[in-house]
């Protein structure tokens, strides 16, 4: 397993981010999704295939987190292999090519986010099957190389239930075994991570964390809550 760098979050996840499976991390804007994924990759010590569909990956931020944690920023940057598909068609090509690129020398694959290009397509219903195929390729990569794959997801407001829900909920939910939701709280910089589904941990557990120059850190006086 890969550590998140936050002890309470690792405990919530049963030790960290699982290998050989897809982990879905979703939430609204500025909840810490990208920071968490970057931090996990940084602390993994290996190469990271990072697919950035939203332009949210920042080399400067990665360098800042590395330096704040006493790591070499240049070494950190050299370990991240960045892909920037411009549309859903190119995203399909990039993910397909990962089968030739990723091997056991990689410690992590991240898609940030898996649904950004999917959402802007006019005929989204026709692309649901294609999204499922991309997830299946990512799952194959995870299993073949025994590494974690993190798929970051966006949210949308579902007027039928009057709450925010993950985009393509059923398509992603079918293939992602562990699902973590991140939410903002009223206190500046304070966030909460809620475990919505896991292979062997109780659902509904939560931990509080802060976003700092070091990335994701334990919240001061933060606590973990496990709900059976």
Where are these regions (language model features)?
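Structural motif
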Residues: 23, 48-49, 107-108, 148-150, ...
């Amino acid at each position: 397993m890969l550590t998140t760098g936050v002890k309470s979050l690792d405990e919530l996840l049963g030790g960290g981010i699982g290998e050989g499976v897809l982990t879905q991390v979703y939430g609204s804007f500025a909840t810490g999704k990208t920071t968490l994924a970057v931090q996990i990759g940084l602390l993994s010590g290996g190469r990271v295939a990072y697919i950035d569909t939203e332009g949210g990956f920042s080399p400067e931020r990665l360098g800042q987190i590395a330096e704040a944690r006493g790591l070499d920023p240049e070494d950190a940057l050299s370990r991240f292999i960045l892909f920037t598909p411009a549309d859903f068609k190119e995203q399909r090509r990039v993910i397909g090519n990962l089968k030739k690129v990723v091997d056991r020398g990689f410690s992590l694959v991240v898609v940030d986010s898996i649904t950004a290009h999917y959402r802007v397509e006019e005929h989204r219903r026709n692309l649901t099957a294609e999204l499922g195929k991309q997830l299946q390729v990512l799952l194959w990569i995870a299993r073949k190389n025994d590494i974690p794959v993190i798929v970051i997801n966006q949210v949308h407001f579902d007027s039928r239930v009057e709450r925010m829900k993950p985009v393509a909920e059923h398509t992603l939910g079918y293939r992602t075994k562990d699902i973590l939701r991140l939410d903002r709280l009223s206190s500046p910089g304070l966030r909460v991570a809620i475990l919505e589904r896991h292979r062997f941990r109780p659902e509904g557990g939560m931990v509080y964390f802060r976003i700092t120059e070091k990335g994701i850190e334990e919240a001061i006086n933060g606590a973990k809550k496990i709900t059976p």
